[in-house]
Amino acid sequence: MKVYLVGGAVRDRLLGIPVQEQDWVVVGATPEELLKRKYRQVGRDFPVFLHPETKEEYALARTERKSAPGYYGFICDFSESVTLEEDLARRDLTINAMAMDEQGNLIDPYQGQRDLEEKLLRHVSSAFAEDPVRVLRVARFASRFHHLGFRIANETRLLMYSMVKQGELAHLIPERVWQEWQKSLEEKNPEQFILSLRSCDALRVILPEINSLFGVPNPHQYHQEIDTGIHSLMTLRASSELSEEPLVRFAALVHDLGKASTPIQAWPKHHGHEEEGTKLIRALCARLRIPNDYRDLAVTVARAHLNIHRVCELRPNTIVKLLEQVDAFRRPQLFHKILIACQADAESCGKTVVYRQTQLWNEILSECVKVTPQTFIVQGYEGKAIKEAMHQSRVACVERIMTSWKSNEK
């Protein structure tokens, strides 16, 4: 029995970046042998074991043979005769198909180290085309390593394009699409996930709602980039510089989804795109089974972002109503996420923008939350009268703040 460190841990060691987790491959062993050594089996479709002390994953070396369409259509062989090279051959990219033995020697049958040096994301073999999830994984790795200068190899992009044309992506299940997309939202350059899918025509199949934004014009006075798809990616990029939270980044990306539904004759204006966007976001989240917290934040940002931007033009009563509608008084941290997504929208154009709306909204909220029911209960207010009195008191707070703010702006 021989044990090898494999995959991402080897890749990241060679890149000199922190190793998040270690995966191991066991060659020349049986499930029974590992169980005798107190490893605990956790794999359902093929033998994966947890080390009795480190709890790291140890998988028996295996080969995979395509037997049916889709992610689960594989027959696995994990017999003792499977070699390390055969196990590495089934992996997606050469940079993920390297191993190290217990002495630290590199085993690299598919030139992964060379591709690391050349900063290429290249498929190991034509077997790449057997698994549609790999298109998503390549896009995710593009988002992870873009800041290091990595790019997708031309032949790999062509293979991905061929998979799209052959309809292989139709076999993707919603959970896997969202799993890879969500992971990409946590990376340094989440916009590269979308760009990579678009470059091989996969975005049209996987995320048609976002793909439809490309080619839709925006008013030039507000968006120098003009194209709504480009603007959405710029907003996503800006949000990734403001927040590491994938919820915020998701909301920033889809905030203008409704503009894809604007009739051509109305371009470049998009009246009502906010509410139209909420419908499309709900449908997208239902289709891909995206968690409710992502959906709810994205819907709120889509609906409210224009009013957030033009706070100085709103009446105090409208401002308080907006804060009530987004539950800002009970959930100020949620409102903070909304503000970040809106700030990303404003700053995405690349101009030197000072988004003072964030400061103003925070000042308004901090004063309004000081208005509590107890103040009015001791005065004898009851029931709905308490709620109305609190509302009016908050409106008065906003009036004072706006008066002071506008006088300072002069």
UniProtKB/Swiss-Prot annotation:
Cofactor dependency: Mg(2+); Ni(2+)
UniProt entry keywords in alphabetical sequence: ATP-binding, Hydrolase, Magnesium, Metal-binding, Multifunctional enzyme, Nickel, Nucleotide-binding, Nucleotidyltransferase, RNA repair, RNA-binding, Transferase, tRNA processing
Catalytic reaction annotation: a tRNA precursor + 2 CTP + ATP = a tRNA with a 3' CCA end + 3 diphosphate; a tRNA with a 3' CCA end + 2 CTP + ATP = a tRNA with a 3' CCACCA end + 3 diphosphate
Pfam family, one: HD
Gene3D superfamilies assigned: Beta Polymerase, domain 2, cca-adding enzyme, domain 2
Comment text on domains: Comprises two domains: an N-terminal domain containing the nucleotidyltransferase activity and a C-terminal HD domain associated with both phosphodiesterase and phosphatase activities.
Remarks, miscellaneous: A single active site specifically recognizes both ATP and CTP and is responsible for their addition.
Protein name listed in UniProt: Multifunctional CCA protein
Species of origin: Legionella pneumophila (strain Lens)
